[in-house]
Amino acid sequence: MRILVLHGPNLNLLGKREPEIYGTLSLDDINGALEALGAEFESDLGFFQSNSEGALVDAIQQAPENYDGILINPAAYTHTSVALRDALAAIGLPFVEVHLSNIHRREEFRHHSYLAPLALGQICGFGLDSYLLGLRALFNHIKN
């Protein structure tokens, strides 16, 4: 089983950016924890981070060639990107949307997700555990 992990804009700044909201773990720390969990499931993970909406759309469109599912933190594009939503709808791979912070406890504009209606589920507010829970759920869905 192969899973693509997509990280949206500004997540390359994790560990430095607003640690009171996003915590102190770096993106490498998160990827390392996901890699360890992937090994438990005998799964290969691919990782991609971009601040560019188009690059993320390209990665989504190419995913069916090599991956069985997607774990995505679309970050700010959660609330704005019809392009990401349409790309995910077009390819038909199962995906889980994750967020480090609870987007529903934050500013009003962060409460809406264009992706959530298409996702297997959305997990938010648990920091690193949002990613780990999302990956476990995706593994279980694909296996069953």
Curated annotation (Swiss-Prot):
<feature type="site" description="Transition state stabilizer">
    <location>
        <position position="17"/>
    </location>
</feature>
<dbReference type="InterPro" id="IPR036441">
    <property type="entry name" value="DHquinase_II_sf"/>
</dbReference>
<dbReference type="GO" id="GO:0003855">
    <property type="term" value="F:3-dehydroquinate dehydratase activity"/>
</dbReference>
<feature type="binding site">
    <location>
        <begin position="100"/>
        <end position="101"/>
    </location>
    <ligand>
        <name>substrate</name>
    </ligand>
</feature>
<feature type="active site" description="Proton donor">
    <location>
        <position position="99"/>
    </location>
</feature>
<dbReference type="Pfam" id="PF01220">
    <property type="entry name" value="DHquinase_II"/>
</dbReference>
<keyword id="KW-0456">Lyase</keyword>
<feature type="binding site">
    <location>
        <position position="73"/>
    </location>
    <ligand>
        <name>substrate</name>
    </ligand>
</feature>
<protein>
    <recommendedName>
        <fullName>3-dehydroquinate dehydratase</fullName>
        <ecNumber>4.2.1.10</ecNumber>
    </recommendedName>
</protein>
<comment type="function">
    <text>Catalyzes a trans-dehydration via an enolate intermediate.</text>
</comment>
<dbReference type="GO" id="GO:0009423">
    <property type="term" value="P:chorismate biosynthetic process"/>
</dbReference>
<feature type="binding site">
    <location>
        <position position="110"/>
    </location>
    <ligand>
        <name>substrate</name>
    </ligand>
</feature>
<keyword id="KW-0028">Amino-acid biosynthesis</keyword>
<dbReference type="GO" id="GO:0009073">
    <property type="term" value="P:aromatic amino acid family biosynthetic process"/>
</dbReference>
<dbReference type="InterPro" id="IPR001874">
    <property type="entry name" value="DHquinase_II"/>
</dbReference>
<feature type="active site" description="Proton acceptor">
    <location>
        <position position="22"/>
    </location>
</feature>
<keyword id="KW-0057">Aromatic amino acid biosynthesis</keyword>
<dbReference type="InterPro" id="IPR018509">
    <property type="entry name" value="DHquinase_II_CS"/>
</dbReference>
<dbReference type="GO" id="GO:0019631">
    <property type="term" value="P:quinate catabolic process"/>
</dbReference>
<feature type="binding site">
    <location>
        <position position="79"/>
    </location>
    <ligand>
        <name>substrate</name>
    </ligand>
</feature>
<dbReference type="GO" id="GO:0008652">
    <property type="term" value="P:amino acid biosynthetic process"/>
</dbReference>
<comment type="pathway">
    <text>Metabolic intermediate biosynthesis; chorismate biosynthesis; chorismate from D-erythrose 4-phosphate and phosphoenolpyruvate: step 3/7.</text>
</comment>
<feature type="binding site">
    <location>
        <position position="86"/>
    </location>
    <ligand>
        <name>substrate</name>
    </ligand>
</feature>
<comment type="similarity">
    <text>Belongs to the type-II 3-dehydroquinase family.</text>
</comment>
<comment type="subunit">
    <text>Homododecamer.</text>
</comment>
